[in-house]
Structures are given as structure tokens and as C-alpha cells.
Amino acid sequence: MKHLKQFLLMAMLLFTLAPLQVSAKENIDVKEILWGHIKDSYEWHITKVGDHPVVIHLPIIVKSSTGWHVFCSSEFSEEKDANGDRPGPFNLVIKNADAQANPNKIVEKVGDQEVRPLDISITKTICVLFIDAIILLLCVLIPARWCRKHKVDDPAPKGFVGLMHMFIMSVYTDVIEATLGKEAPKYAPWLLTCFFFIFVANIMGIVPFPPGGGNLTGNIACTVFFGVTTFLITNFTGTKEYWKEIFWPEVPTWLKVPVPLMPFIELFGIFTKPLALIIRLFANMMAGHAIALSFAAIIFIMFNISENAIANYVAGTGMTIVSVAMSAFMMLLEVLVSYIQALVFTMLSAVFISLAHVKSHEAEPEVVK
């Protein structure tokens, strides 16, 4: 409890003194702060020392009209041109965030036209993806190594291996096996991968400094991959009875012909299930990051609310106490949400897969009156 009080005191002092460096006449763009954390980027912004940002420059790999080019993102100028773009080598520029076409993306200027080159650069999101994948491999391979060296009747593992063993078995037993039954071993690798990757990505997104801080599950491309993969597994492994119930369900005939109302609804449901997985995970994680950043941005706004420095300091200090308390609460809530979202995604994926394994309806036993 004593250490918790010291931590909260240091946090309040940090949030109180940091905004004092901001000029009272400087406008705080909350939208830029929020989207700067959520959106993808060719560099990893860490902090700002005075007027100099501290960033990790990432590799740029593009194929333009002049061929393949590999260089560092630091080659792009920090000074923006008349259009608000950041010029770089080989007639390449990074478009500004407010551009109607390709915002924050690399384009090639060919005469008066702007052409989007083949871009396979290692962006912030890709870098976070690699880091989370490495952490996930370590979390799985270390317990796997222990299992290979021990017998089934050996004492239960302790420490990190014991924690991961408990985690894996709880998800497998309570979610996957309880939903899929005998089919559980077949789909357990994918469902366990979904749970642990989403959970690791969510937890790493809460960490405010590298290698954390990336909002991977708040990126629609990441959630689309998981949703589409579950969609493909569900439908390509479905039974004949599953497809029969979609195109010719056991409902009154007038609901199927001449207007195929129920088949259309069932077919539409095939696509809404993965869409629900995608939107639920994306929206929840992006909203959590946005709310946490909003509490921090309120401090800077209150320190620049008027021209009176004393009034700004009083308002900012008072809001700092409230903001730090709410931010701490949101961080704890984000940890809980990180687990819940990973569990819900895995559970719904298992349910959707189980619904595709419909067996032939057996004849009901006759009831003796």
C-alpha cells in the first residue's frame, strides 16, 4: 500500500510538471494526439525532449517506377513542403494526415501525378506484430520444453511454466473442449493461438513505452485477419448437414419457395458472424486506448485554458489529480478488458465452428401414450 501511494504521488507530479513546459499560447490538438497513437506510422514516436522528438526510425521498402528502394524513414525530411507533405529520396513523399488520398502513406511524384508504389515497409504496426509474435512464441515454447522433459505423472510445474500451464488448460478445458467436444483437439491450435495472441497484443498495447505501446488489436487489418481466418475454417470444414440447413433449412416450404427468404437469411448470417468478431474486438480495444489518452490530454488542455498562468496552474493541477485517478482506473480496466476480449473472441470462434459441425438429425423415439 505504501509503494502504491508513492507511485500515485510520482505520477501526479509527473503529469503536473510536464504540461508546464507547454506554452500557454500553444494549442493542443487532441485529435492529433489520439490518432498519433492509434494510426500506423513509418516511425515509432517515444517521447519529446524539449522541441526534439525522440523516435525510432523504421526501414522503408518500396518499389517505385525506378525500381526497389530500401532506406531508413529518417531520410524523409521533418520539414513539410507547401502541401504539408514530407519529401524524401527518389521522388517519394509521405502525405499529410489531412490528405484526401493516401493520408500518412508514401506516394511517388511522377510529373503532376501522385502514384502509390508497392509498399512493404516495416511500419510501427508490423514492428509491434513481430514483437508480440516473439513474446507469444516464448510463452508457448518454454512450457513446451518443460513438458518434453517431464512425464505425465511428475509433479505440476511451478513459476512461469505453471502459470502458462494453468492458462492453457483453463482455456482448452472450459472453452474449447466444452464447446467442440471430440472435435476440440483438431481446432485447439488455432483457437489457442487466437486467445494468446490477442491477449498478448492487448497487454502490450497498455505498456506506454517500447516494446509496448502499439495498438495492434485496435488496427482493423489485424482483426480482419483473425475474423476472416475463423470464417474460412468454419465454412471449409462444415458438414453437409450444415450447408443443407443454410440453403434448405427445415422450415415451412412457403419460407423457402418461391421467395427464398430463410435461405437468404441463413446465407447472410454466414458473413455477419465473422463481421461481429472483427468489429467487437476492433471497437473495444480502440475505444479503450482513446479514452485513456483523452484523460491524459485533458491535463494539457486545462493548463492552457486561459491567458492567466496562475489560473491555468490551479485548473491543471486540480484536473491532474482527477485525470491520474481515472487513468489508473482505466489501466486496470484495460487489463481486465484485454483478457475478456481475448476470451470472448475465442469462445465465439469455437461456437461458430461447432455450429458448422451439424450432424444428421436422428429419428426421434416414439412416445408411448
Predicted segments with their positions:
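Alpha-helical transmembrane segments
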Residues: 4-11, 130, 187-191, 219, ...
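Membrane-interface helix termini and inter-helical loops of multi-pass transporters
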Residues: 209-213
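Perimembrane topogenic segments of multi-pass inner/organellar membrane proteins
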Residues: 2-6, 20-158
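Membrane-interface helix starts
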Residues: 6, 179-189, 283
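Hydrophobic alpha-helical transmembrane segments and adjacent short intramembrane/lumenal linkers
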Residues: 192-196, 200-207, 217, 221-225, ...
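Bacterial N-terminal signal peptides
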Residues: 10-19
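Cytosolic juxtamembrane amphipathic/interface segments immediately preceding
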Residues: 115-117, 169-183
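Juxtamembrane interface elements at the cytosolic ends of transmembrane helices
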Residues: 138-176, 238-245, 360-361
